[in-house]
């Protein structure tokens, strides 16, 4: 029995394709899917911060796990090359007003 060959994949950006910078991501989960909501944190004053959400992406649980695996590997590669990524201990997941 022969192993099927991989198809030649051609990546094409649709006219709606956009790139943007996000320094905020919210994750919402249901039994059917994961929703990643990307945004930018915009300080308004010393006591007010606004999060401007600009894109929501739904993923199946399987695709969310595949993304997790890919991100894990790429973070490991990044830290091997550039050093450990330090997180602000005050901003651990689940500590803010949006989880």
Q: What do the predicted segments below correspond to?
A:
Residues 1-62, 69-99:
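N-terminal intrinsically disordered, cationic/polar leader segments
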């Amino acid at each position: 029995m022969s192993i099927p060959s991989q198809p030649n994949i051609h990546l094409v950006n649709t006219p709606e394709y956009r790139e943007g910078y996000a320094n905020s991501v919210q994750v919402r989960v249901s039994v059917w899917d994961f929703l990643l909501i990307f945004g930018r944190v915009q300080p308004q004053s010393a006591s007010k911060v606004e999060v401007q959400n600009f894109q929501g992406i739904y993923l199946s649980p399987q695709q969310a796990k595949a993304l997790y695996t890919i991100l894990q590997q790429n973070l490991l590669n990044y830290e091997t090359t550039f050093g450990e990524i330090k997180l602000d201990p005050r901003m651990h997941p689940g500590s803010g007003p949006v989880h």
